[in-house]
């Protein structure tokens, strides 16, 4: 399918397809959530999360959970799912996983963890999406 490494735009398109196909019990949390793709996580993000290996981070949900929002948050930045292109592509190469499925599972994982879903719940959501 790809004769060259997928671009940022390719990953954005896959993530948008993933959001459109995400299981309903997770989709209800996603009103107004954006998608951003960066090549690699920056040092500040890695430090904030306590992650030493930048290649280990494929995505991150940045935002405020719905239950923690207040009327005073009107001017806050919109929530965004950040996908890290190069770590995703490395995992894609190493595992042979379908790229859409890999991106979809990163999106599901980030959203679900942000909203407090357990690892078992996340595995169930990934199965539902298949």
Language model regions located:
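Active-site rim/adjacent substrate-binding subdomains
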Residues: 1-102, 114, 118-124, 129
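Catalytic glutamate of the conserved HExxH
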Residues: 106, 110-114
């Amino acid at each position: 399918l790809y004769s060259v490494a997928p671009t940022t735009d390719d990953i954005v398109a896959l993530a948008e397809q993933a959001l459109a196909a995400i299981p309903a019990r997770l989709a209800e949390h996603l009103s107004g959530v954006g998608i951003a793709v960066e090549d690699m996580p920056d040092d500040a993000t890695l430090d904030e999360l306590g992650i030493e290996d930048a290649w280990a981070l494929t995505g991150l949900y940045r935002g405020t959970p719905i239950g923690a929002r207040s009327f005073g948050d009107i001017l806050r930045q919109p929530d965004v799912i950040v996908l890290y292109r190069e770590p995703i592509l490395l995992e894609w190469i190493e595992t042979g996983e379908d790229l859409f499925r890999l991106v979809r599972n990163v999106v599901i994982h980030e959203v679900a963890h942000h909203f407090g879903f357990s690892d078992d719940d996340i595995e169930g959501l990934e199965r539902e999406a298949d």
